[in-house]
Structure formats: C-alpha cells, structure tokens
UniProtKB/Swiss-Prot annotation:
PANTHER family: COILED-COIL DOMAIN-CONTAINING PROTEIN 182
GO biological process terms on file: female gonad development
Keyword annotations: Coiled coil
Superkingdom field: Eukaryota
Protein name: Coiled-coil domain-containing protein 182
Amino acid sequence: MEALFQAGSILMKVNTLQGKKMVESGLQSGDLSLSQSWPSYLPLPADLEILQQKVAGVQRELEDFKEEALKAIRYLEDAFCQMSGVLAQQEEQAARVKQRLREEEDRGIVRNKVLTFLLPREKQLREHCQRLENMLVRSHNPLRAIRKSQAD
C-alpha cells in the first residue's frame, strides 16, 4: 500500500509497510551536513549562514514530514485493525447464515420425506373413511331396512 505525502515543498512516496522503519531510522540531523570531500575552500560567512538556515529549514521540514508520516502510518494501522475486526465479524455472520441455510435445507428434506410418506396414507385413510361412512349410512337407512325385509 503506497501513499503520497506532502511535506513543505517535498512530495514523497512512502511504502507504508516499510515506511515506519524508514521514517524512524531515516535521515538524522547530521546527514545533511557538508562532507569532507568538498573542496578545501569554505564559503563566505554570509553564504554559510544562508546555507545553515536552508539546512535548518530542510531539517524542520524533514521532522514535520516524519511526524506526518508516522501519524499517517498509525492511522492506516488503526484503519487496518478496524477493517480486520469488521471482516472477522462478517465472516462469523456468513458462517452462521450458512449454518442456518444448511439447517433449513435439512428441515426441508425431512419435511419432503414426511410429506411423501403421509400424503398417500392420507389418501388411503380418506378412502377408507368414505367406505366406512357409506356402510354406516346404509346400515342406518330405514328405507333400506324395509326394502331388505320385503325382499326376504
């Protein structure tokens, strides 16, 4: 994950995974001093003062940049932690939903098996009840009893 940061007039790209170490162990105040390989002549005191002021300004910008970069890195770390927490919650919720779906599917399968078993039995029972009702009605029908006795 890379981000752009502006510190004064310096625009830098910082890799946030390595950025914290780079910022914390980066340039020190002595890193901007003049090296011994410069020519043996020294600039005039006025020029030297201007250079020192510029170096001090750059060092302030560097410190400001370090603070901003560390703040941005901490913010990104916090955001990442929050996103990880939310992701874990969503994964748990998805697992619960999948479990409920499996349970519903299992109940549906059982329900279908029960219905497959009971529906033909219900039809048989209805037919049997109908026959019994018809027999009962015939046995209690007085006209039928009279006709039966006349036939004898």
